[in-house]
Amino acid sequence: MREFNHNDLEILEEKTAWSGFWKLKLFRLRHRRFAGGWSEALTRELHCRGEAVGVLLYDPKLDALGMVEQFRIGAAFRAGSPWLLELVAGLVEEGETPAEVAVRETTEESGCVIQELLPVAGYFSSPGGTDEYFHLFCARVSLAGAGGLHGKPGEHEDIRLHVIPHAEVPELQRGGHFNNAHTLIALQWLAMHRDEVRRAWT
């Protein structure tokens, strides 16, 4: 079976349709087809988000997770609350590595200090319309006495940290309390690797 790569894509035109906090680019392109030959010229919109990081905070001694709650505009127009329970997360800025972002965002959003950082996965969050590439980590932290409000006021962040015993996670999942894809992926990973992680970190 033939494998396709960047040589099988031709960009005919590229322009910026919108530039604000995010960019929206408009492309005219064509690509090779599985049956042979080239597609007709296609128009595709691309929401340019770049790279992002998500961090699952885990305390192996307490066997507990740290989750943040904050308002999300993307959830504001569906049933349920637009305040989501999710991972610590943030964007990779120029000159930063994903691991550095994980450390920075963990401090800003939770007040916790990462003691050890374990890569979990890297993936495109929704490649049909955005170029965002997500780096997922699990971080060993101490959640003893953790909680309260966090975030950078200058960035209008209003974040509440929740400490959740791992034993309560299945019931919360069944109740639909985790509806963010990155969070669900991280929780599934922890369910598969929790015993191994606890042995390594305790």
Spell out what each predicted region is.
Residues 29-34, 126-147:
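Active-site-adjacent beta-strand/loop module that shapes the phosphate/pyrophosphate-binding cleft
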Residues 24-26, 67, 136-138, 161-163:
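Conserved hydrophobic/aromatic beta-strand scaffold that supports enzyme active sites
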Residues 44-47, 64-104, 153-155, 159:
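Conserved Nudix-box catalytic region and its N-terminal flanking loop in Nudix hydrolases
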Residues 1-15:
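A short, amphipathic edge element
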